[in-house]
């Protein structure tokens, strides 16, 4: 489920019912655009990975872990019971796991309850800019250039995928 549904945007901005189809299309476009900039989907998804333990830790490929479903030691086929999760880093308490390959099954993304307010604000502002640009194009205005303002870009940079 989308962590920031169109219905919430509709309520916040009090959008006109006569323009709902266009607004929903622009909102979907805005979400896809932001996900492309960030490098990951906003919506919570399930991921499966194989990672090798180095220095008693492994790194997930995804940010914003919402649930660690399972960690299996592929060497012993046993569940790894104790770990500490900090961002994309999983610290393992059992030193015997060093060098082992682990199967990670986890959920990552944003939920409605965990969606950051500043990211929601950036989505709203970008939606309004896209709508303004769309109206200009409909009116055949010459100035239809689109550029993300610095304040929105700064917010998106906070959440942009960082490589390890």
Please tell me what each predicted stretch does.
Residues 1-164:
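Divalent metal-cofactor coordination and adjacent catalytic microenvironments
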């Amino acid at each position: 489920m989308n962590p920031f549904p169109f219905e919430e945007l509709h309520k916040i901005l009090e959008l006109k019912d006569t323009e709902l189809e266009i607004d929903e299309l622009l909102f979907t476009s805005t979400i896809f655009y932001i996900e492309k900039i960030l490098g990951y989907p906003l919506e919570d998804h399930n991921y499966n990975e194989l990672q090798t333990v180095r220095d008693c830790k492994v790194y997930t490929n995804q940010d914003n872990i919402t649930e660690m479903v399972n960690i299996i030691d592929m060497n012993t086929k046993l569940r790894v019971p104790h770990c500490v999760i900090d961002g994309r880093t999983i610290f393992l308490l059992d030193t015997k796991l060093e060098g082992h390959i682990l199967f990670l099954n986890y959920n990552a993304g944003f939920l409605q309850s965990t969606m950051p307010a500043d990211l929601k604000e950036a989505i709203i502002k970008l939606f309004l800019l896209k709508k303004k640009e769309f109206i200009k194009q409909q009116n055949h205005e010459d100035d239809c250039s689109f550029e993300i303002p610095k304040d929105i870009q700064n917010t998106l940079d906070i959440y942009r995928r960082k490589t390890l």
